[in-house]
């Protein structure tokens, strides 16, 4: 039986037992240094650190590879500490990180898609707005924030029928709960710092809603769902995950995710997206038919105010690379103000999105006297404009009502370019309520890998799920659809 501090069987464990012992000593004793007399000393961590130390190590995955220098690199991966000799000539590692037998064949975990498995990966996500290219973009751009991996579901012949992306994360379970809940948890964390911060597998996308891969035989998701139901608990235990989570799946998946309940999963609402049909003749027709008199008056006052001063210029591009460095601080300003945070975009994400998905990516840019003051990152697919991320220059955003200006111009552009539906990412619900948008429920499907903990988790989830603490959500006409 593997001890918690030893490398997993599937790791490339080249470190010696002595090296592992030295690493364990430094990690489990906190900060270390030398006293003025030259004697080594160690600062002991809080007791809670010891309780979860093995799991911290299993998920402390920091890969650093320097191919140009052809040097030895310290590779820390899923609990194993390895010294790896890298060269420019060495091809990418495509061997399974983990392989397990199943009743339908086998399942393998890899961190890159081989040429043999690529057709299954591409066909499995072809019909979705976020296709295989988007998952590769997020893995490349956000790889330092989350460990991006792929689950290969193989049939009895060893042929890969479906490729399902997932993440390894260390997630705070009380994020999104009200202040009194967080204060209670923070009190416990003074003794147990990792209380309700658990290593988990998240099935889905690190920067967007989740989708389930279609299998190559039927072209549907039913076989994949059955395979995930059986394989995920085994994979989770092998990787040291405490929890398994299907992250942010649209309501259309409920009939399939509810099948996971028989496998010990619990479905709860996540923070929903919002949307509205674009069936008006133009924007003025939308204002007149959909919005209340008070809201129309309020918006028109804001638009008149925004028109004062230098004009606001509007442009749409498919590749924002030339402006990525300029717009990123605008996004970061919005990100820092957000009450809930998960992924954080960077220049690489913005640039790769435009270069690799020019057929779907649209970047909307607003300028004042040549300076970019706002931008929006959108995906257009199958008649739907997905308004995913926004950036605002708060030096002028409030005085010029940039949030409302950007929303108006985005909707007008969508109408004029054949979009039938406007989809907006979660949060900031108050203005969307007054825009007469409807909720688009997103679900979490959760299970603990430990059966006893799963019983406790089932009782905690209705308290921890974030939608119950947002009073604005209850005012939407279809709020009852959240569950």
Outline where the language-model segments fall.
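Tryptophan (W) side chains
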Residues: 5-6, 50
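N-terminal, intrinsically disordered, basic low-complexity segments enriched in Arg/Pro/Ser/Thr
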Residues: 7-11, 406
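Alpha-helical membrane-targeting segments
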Residues: 52-55, 59-62, 176-203, 449-480
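Active-site/acyl-donor-binding loops of N-acyltransferases
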Residues: 74, 78-104, 168-172, 209, ...
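A conserved beta-strand-loop-helix scaffold within acyl/acetyltransferase catalytic domains
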Residues: 97-184, 242-398, 482-483
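Hydrophobic alpha-helix feature that most strongly marks membrane-spanning transmembrane helices
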Residues: 332-339, 354-358, 371, 377-378, ...
